Design a protein with these regions (language model features):
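Intrinsic disorder/low-complexity segments
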Residues: 1-24
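Terminal targeting/low-complexity segments that flank the catalytic cores of oxidoreductases
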Residues: 16-121, 125-134, 156-164, 168, ...
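Alpha-helical transition-metal enzyme core signature, strongest for iron centers
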Residues: 109-113, 117, 140-155, 185-199, ...
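Amphipathic alpha-helical segments within well-ordered protein domains
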Residues: 121-125, 200-204, 217, 231-235
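Active-site metal-coordination segments of metallo-dependent hydrolases
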Residues: 137
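Active-site-proximal alpha-helical scaffolds that flank and shape metal-associated catalytic sites
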Residues: 153-221, 248-259
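C-terminal transmembrane helix end/exit motif
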Residues: 155-159, 230-237
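Helix-loop elements that line ligand-binding/catalytic pockets
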Residues: 227-233, 250-253
Length: 325
């Protein structure tokens, strides 16, 4: 008898790929294709992308020194802002913390954008090039590739460690193989709204580093089209989703939002900067940080409530997670 999960324990290794493929097919049966999507809206965002897409290596002046003269995100978005420890830190320590936290957020964004690209390409394999969705999804994949290179370049120039998202392999496996398109669209919107809040604030803050402001501006403009597509998809297709897929999408939407916000600030940052051992606990219990988390999720929660993804049963769970007032 072969135990089904006895990997590396002296037992024969079973082939689990049919099992995984079966689960993936099951969720896809509960998904929908955007066949009723507005062609007019698709043409609008495709045309906008053709007219206004950005090459970060041409648009951004990377020669600006990555020193400690500017913050790398708005001060009030740094995890220790508003605490006694923050008050005791020098300006340079605060700036360095903002740099590491910005690069940690970039690493999380790259990780999630790669997962999204995988799901889009997986879907595109079966889509006709005559379908308008084919062109939009190709544009979105291309955008995400440029964004990942842009954020990777910023991490490299800041000369900080790569803050690899925690449990990334397990979460990536689940996302790639066990989520429906609807659930992935909800989680995509979660990532784009959360990072969009940070980017929008950074782009408008004159105290922030010029490169951070410019790459945030680029990301804000291009992600606005991605969010618009996700909004239209969910508005038109959520009513057609089966009961089981709805339940899974609701759960995954909350889970993915919590994971994304949780991953933004890697716990190793405080140790790497020589901050006191209690810094992590102080940041986690920071009331100001809790308010920022709610602000990050506010636009997402408003939309998901509008389309009934966050319903009366789901709302208390979002509040308990600290993502909803």
């Amino acid at each position: 008898m072969v135990l089904p999960f006895a990997f590396g324990c002296g037992f024969a290794r079973p082939n689990i790929f049919p099992f995984v493929e079966g689960l993936a097919a099951f969720w896809k049966l509960n998904a929908v294709v955007p066949e009723e999507f507005s062609d007019q809206y698709l043409e609008h965002i495709i045309d906008a992308s053709r007219r206004k897409s950005f090459d970060p290596y041409k648009e951004i002046d990377w020669s600006f020194p990555f020193d400690y003269s500017h913050f790398y995100m708005p001060q009030d978005m740094v995890s220790l802002y508003g605490t006694m420890l923050w008050d005791q830190m020098t300006r340079e320590q605060r700036v360095r913390l903002s740099m590491h936290e910005a690069c940690s957020a970039f690493a999380t964004t790259i990780w999630f954008e790669n997962q999204l690209s995988f799901k889009l390409i997986d879907y595109l394999i079966g889509v006709s090039p005559l379908d308008p969705h084919f062109y939009w999804m190709q544009i979105e994949v291309a955008d995400e590739c440029r964004h990942s290179m842009m954020f990777g370049e910023a991490i490299k120039r800041c000369e900080v460690p790569w803050y690899k998202p925690r449990f990334s392999s397990l979460i990536t496996f689940f996302t790639k193989y066990l989520t429906s398109r609807v659930a992935m669209m909800v989680s995509t919107l979660a990532a784009e709204d959360v990072t969009g809040y940070l980017n929008s604030r950074t782009a408008q803050d004159p105290e922030c580093h010029p490169v951070m402001r410019e790459l945030s501006r680029i990301h804000t403009i291009e992600e606005a089209r991605h969010r618009g597509y996700a909004h239209q998809y969910l508005k038109q297709n959520w009513p057609r989703v089966g009961k089981l897929a709805r339940s899974m999408a609701r759960r995954y939407g909350l889970l993915s939002t919590r994971i994304i916000i949780w991953q933004l600030v890697h716990p190793d940052i405080y140790k790497n900067l020589g901050l006191p051992p209690e810094a992590l606990e102080i940041a986690r219990n920071n009331p100001h940080r809790a308010r920022i988390r709610r602000e990050m999720a506010a636009e997402l929660v408003e939309f998901l409530t509008e389309v009934d993804i966050v319903d009366e049963k789901a709302a208390p769970k979002w509040r308990a997670a600290g993502l909803m007032a």
